[in-house]
Amino acid sequence: MKLNIAILLAALAATASASPAGDISEVAVDADASELLVDPRAELPVAPRASFFIDARQDTNGTSQDEIDQWLTAHNDERAQHGPVPLVWNQDLQNAAMSWASRCVYKHNRGGQNIAARYNTRANFPREIDRAVGQWNNERGEYNATTFKGAGHWTQVVWKHSRNLGCAAYSCPQGTLGKKPGDKWKSLWYYVCNYDPKGNVVPASKYYPSNVQP
């Protein structure tokens, strides 16, 4: 699927959690979240096996329990405002997210998936998971409850029948994620979240009204 990249530039010094003066950050969110076409007669997919054991020994691109809590909090705080039950962490979905994120290719590899990227001119810039999910959540004001368009990432975050979540944040090397080798971007974070059952199911007129509550 061809992705249109929406680029937002901001000086982090102007934000509440400002970085040292001079640092520039760029966020990329694919403009078109994927929709899942299903047979209306089909049952919702069965969630993969859940596992909640996380090895405390994590490398730079691992996912610690603290980071899992950040992913869940960023999603479930938003869901709490719109009716759905909280998502629970799923190790299989996380493993799939990490496997894809580690390729550092900026595109979807499945339905029921949100992606985003964050670049910074400073090396070793932190993950900032809350900002990645916050970028998706900020689409809520763009959602059109008549056409069901305009907020594909947000609708997946709050999709009522989604129950399981697995995410990964991966530090990609320079020259990937659409950037050129040797350019100013020193930190390139790639964020991938997988959801099950998958959201954004079409036909939209049948599935969105019962799954998305503005």
Swiss-Prot record:
Keyword Iron-sulfur listed? The answer is no
Record domain SCP: where? 72-195
Q: Which GO terms describe its cellular component?
A: extracellular region
Signal peptide positions on this chain: 1-18
InterPro entries with a match to the protein in the record: Allrgn_V5/Tpx1_CS, CAP_dom, CAP_sf, CRISP-related
- Which cell locations does it reside in? Secreted
- Highest taxon in the source lineage: Eukaryota
Could you tell me the keywords of this UniProt record? Fruiting body, Glycoprotein, Secreted, Signal
Attached carbohydrates are found at: 61, 144
Q: Which Gene3D superfamilies match?
A: CAP
Q: Would the keyword Cell membrane turn up in this protein's UniProt record? A: no
Assign the protein's first listed, main location to one coarse class.
secreted
| UniProt similarity note | Belongs to the CRISP family.
Protein's name according to its UniProt entry: Fruiting body protein SC14
Species annotation: Schizophyllum commune
